[in-house]
Amino acid sequence: MKKHFTKLLCISLLFNFLLKGDQLNALVPYYYLPTIKNLEKESLSIGRNAYQLLYFGQIKESLNLAKLAVKINKLDEKLWLILSESQIANNLYEEALISLKKAENINPNLSEIYFSKSSIFLKQLNLKEAKIALKSGLRITPKNHKAIFQLGNIFLMEKNYLSAIKFFDKAIKIKPEFWQAINNKGLAYFEQDKINKSIELFEKAISLEENAEPLLGLASCLRLQDINSAILLAKKALIKNPNYVEYNYRKEQLWGEKIQISTEKLLKNDQLKQDIKNAKLKINQSS
């Protein structure tokens, strides 16, 4: 009996020891250490979230998430691109250029890197570097109509109207319904005093998209030929986008000196006095 009891006691003590061992293990925190693959997957998810926040205008939150994504995974060029976009949105242009350089070091064959660089250089009014970046990107994707259009815009800013028209034509050839390129081609022809050609182009742009810019551009063309039509077009343009009442806003849209002078004269017409007042009121209310 004693021998049997001793055996039972040993079993009982062993059981208690094992039980206590389980309880002890339950108190030790368990850390999950993710694999490199899981970390990379997580960084891409964070990067996508950062891009979504950027899309919805939450630029500071987007920047913080994008920074976290590249901290987790420094070897994905797409994450560096997302970070650069967030930095651009936050006006951190030099930091964005550093991020783009890191992306370029990982994958120099990604045209988006060079197109993003060009957008920064344009904001800095560094037209020379913007052109170099655009041409580098176009060597990779030669049929990117937006990049070709942007090159045309740079030539328009430089008052090199023949080259501007040449690149706008290239963009239109790739995308015939590209009304912005058609519109800007009209701006270039106006500065060359080819008003009838501008009229034709602005009308074509309006047929594709009844936007304020070609409407007011056409109005400026018709100012001396058909003032009644010009007034109606200007009224419609200012309703669609009141900002076009401002000289500096039109300048930002690459309007040249000659079309600016024509537009200023048109906007002084007494029949547009109330329309101009309403447009300025809307601008003040939205600011």
Describe every region a protein language model picked out:
Residues 39-78, 82-89, 119, 123, ...:
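Alpha-helical segment of the N-proximal tetratricopeptide repeat
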Residues 27-34, 236-287:
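Terminal, low-structured helical/coil segments at or just beyond the last alpha-helical repeat
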Residues 54, 81, 88, 115, ...:
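Position-specific recognition of the canonical hydrophobic site in helix A of tetratricopeptide repeat
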Residues 203-212, 216-246, 270-272:
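TPR/TPR-like (Sel1-like) alpha-helical repeat modules
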